[in-house]
Amino acid sequence: MVLKNLSLLIILFFSTSVFSVSNNLINIPITVVATATGADSKTLSDLKNINGLNLQIPAKCFTKGKLPFLASSDEVRFNCLRDALFDKSDNVVWSLRGGYGSARIIPDLLKLSKPNKEKFFIGYSDITALHLFLSQEWGWRTIHGSNIADLLKTEKDQGNFTKLGEILKGKVKQVTIDNLIPLNDIAKSSDLVKGNLTGGNLTMVQTSIGTRWQIKTKGKILFLEDTNVAPFRLDRELLHLKQSMLLEGVKAIIFGSFGKDLDATMLVLRNFAYSLNIPVFKTNRFGHERINDPIIYNTNSKIIMSKHKEFKLIMEL
């Protein structure tokens, strides 16, 4: 009887915590897209059963293709994304999860004309490929933020979704990321840096190099994050960015989390920062770890230093 009651309490607690999280997203119509790796039927069912969420998860978009690490075939994933971006609804287009596969459908996206209506588009990790396309080709202000499946992950800070909900409902005029730590002397003395934002997952940014959707960095504040990256690999990827001349004209760089940010990882980031003549900052407020604050592409943004010499990123909506 004790075990049975304990089980009921656990179920009740889980249900209540999910409901309180989703409460901030109530009445927001959302179309879920899976442009990369998919999810099992239980994950999809659990998402559909979150009280208060208005999710549209088209079953036709989750038919396995030849490659098991993709949600469905390239054709199906492209068609489902296209339909979500172009339909007449006001639905938010929200990525299910990252993984791998978004870059595979960009050649088809490049054939499309820009739709008449801009929609909110949210996701991160592998979804960086789509952010670069949508922000550069269509001029959209997309949101680098938690994928919708993160709602089911207890290790994620559900405040990530509170902040996203505030943006979607128009409750805020500014979005900020605090606790930027300067990594080089130029950053320490920078009281104001202005520029629109671009970037995302470092691996995907590197993947873009040499493609038709290559990242455009000139005059921008570049933000970068990644996960489970060995220090030597991190150094190699950053070196590639630098030697590709993609850091020429960049206003500043903000590094998010890179896994557990081991001492060796921080050594690589600091060493890289001191090799550049631009301000470089570090924060744990976005990326694959517990906290993933939203960052908005193509917004008027600035990094400011307070009178206490603390730094923050401010994005105007």
Curated annotation (Swiss-Prot):
GO molecular function, one term: serine-type peptidase activity
Pfam families documented for this protein: Peptidase_S66 (PF02016), Peptidase_S66C (PF17676)
The name this protein goes by in its record: Putative carboxypeptidase RP402
BP-aspect Gene Ontology terms: proteolysis
Family stated for the protein in its record: Belongs to the peptidase S66 family.
EC number(s) stated in the UniProt entry for this protein: 3.4.16.-
Keyword hit for Protease: yes
Active site residues according to the UniProt entry: S125, E225, H288
Lineage: Bacteria, Pseudomonadati, Pseudomonadota, Alphaproteobacteria, Rickettsiales
